[in-house]
């Protein structure tokens, strides 16, 4: 991609692999029998944390560039870690892995950096405890470090108070080991990478509206996984192409899962010029996305759209500053409990840039 003050942004680019799918490929590949081959793996610190945690539990994982080969241990083949499982800054690793650890035949301690040790874990501790898990907060504050003693689990139906793919996935992963059916209902549909990957690995998973239902698994089968580019990373280039004068850029092989494509919907709501050519390839749906400089207009973003773009709200707020009229973002409270309070950070940062914003709620 080329940038010039005279010609704007021009050209094509490829972005790194999807973070959510990368995490899940490590976890399910580790629990499968046989080899799982992953292409397009995201080499970010969070995904490496997932990889290292499962290595600590005896899984052999070969890593070369964006290719990962996982030598699965089977559903019941994980070994007790010799050290504390350090998730770094990864909330996804913490919450999803806890669902797996709750059913193992060993004890484990899960810790992360200072940010992780402030993030709320009661949202997974409650449903796991209802399933029979022994999971406690070491400091008694419902945050990491977490102490988990594996126990036999039983299936439950859980009405989640939040639309969170991490909470849902934690429960579904525990459900693989539970006695009986496990189901989760959310207020809105959250991203469904776990459900799609469950299906690919041969797990009995069904969805109906905002409910996901899993039956206990006997065996998972190693797979070949092709990971598309992360739409959350693409969002920054999409925004740049829309607001930079005289621009036209194409972003290759971007994941357009319909539980993650909220940014594309917002661009259309704001009047942006965007097209995408769907790709015919294995794995989750993907496309080459092209955007051009556009005159944007304000819009209202709320409700069921929020879980589809929760990680893209900071860049959407930037787009809104270049749009004609007011943009309102509602129902975004989840941003307050990320690695930082993203709402406050956005409000303060944009004030320093003299951009007109009020705090989002």
Question: PLM ranges: what are they?
Answer:
Residues 46, 50:
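N-terminal cofactor/phosphate-binding cores enriched in small/glycine residues
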Residues 54, 259-274:
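Conserved loop->alpha-helix
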Residues 62, 171, 275-277, 318, ...:
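Interaction-mediating elements
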Residues 132-137:
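A glycine-rich helix N-cap at a beta->alpha junction
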Residues 197, 203, 236, 240, ...:
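A structural feature that tracks compact, well-ordered secondary-structure segments
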Residues 351-357:
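Conserved small/polar residues in nucleotide/adenosyl-binding loops
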């Amino acid at each position: 991609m080329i940038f010039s003050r005279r010609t704007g942004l021009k050209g094509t680019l490829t972005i790194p692999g999807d973070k959510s799918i990368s995490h899940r490929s490590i976890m399910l590949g580790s629990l499968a029998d046989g080899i799982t081959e992953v292409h397009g793996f995201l080499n970010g610190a969070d995904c490496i944390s997932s990889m290292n945690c499962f290595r600590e539990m005896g899984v052999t994982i070969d890593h070369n560039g964006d290719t990962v080969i996982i030598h699965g241990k089977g559903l019941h083949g994980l070994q007790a870690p010799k050290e504390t499982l350090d998730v770094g800054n990864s909330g996804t690793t913490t919450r999803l892995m806890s669902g797996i650890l709750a059913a193992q035949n060993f004890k484990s301690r899960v810790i992360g950096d200072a940010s992780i040790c402030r993030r709320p874990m009661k949202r997974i501790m409650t449903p796991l405890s209802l399933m029979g898990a022994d999971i406690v907060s070491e400091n008694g504050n419902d945050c990491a470090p977490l102490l988990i003693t594996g126990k036999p689990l039983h299936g439950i139906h859980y009405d989640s108070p939040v639309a969170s793919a991490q909470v849902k996935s934690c429960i579904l992963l525990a459900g693989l080991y539970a006695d009986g059916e496990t189901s989760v209902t959310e207020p809105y549909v959250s991203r469904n990478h776990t459900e799609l990957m469950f299906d690919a690995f041969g797990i009995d998973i069904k969805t109906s509206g905002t409910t996901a239902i899993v039956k206990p698994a006997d065996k998972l089968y190693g797979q070949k996984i092709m990971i598309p580019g992360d739409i959350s990373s693409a969002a920054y280039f999409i925004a740049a192409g829309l607001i930079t004068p005289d621009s036209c850029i194409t972003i290759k092989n971007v994941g357009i899962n319909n539980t993650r494509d909220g940014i594309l919907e917002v661009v259309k709501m704001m009047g942006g010029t965007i097209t995408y050519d769907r790709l015919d390839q294995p794995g989750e749906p993907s496309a080459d996305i092209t955007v051009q400089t556009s005159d944007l207009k304000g819009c209202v973003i709320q409700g069921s759209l929020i879980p589809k773009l929760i990680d893209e709200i900071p860049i959407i707020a930037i787009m809104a500053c270049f749009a004609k009229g007011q943009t309102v973002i509602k129902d975004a409270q989840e941003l307050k409990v990320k690695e930082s309070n993203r709402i406050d950070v956005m409000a303060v940062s944009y004030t320093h840039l003299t951009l007109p914003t009020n705090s989002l709620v």
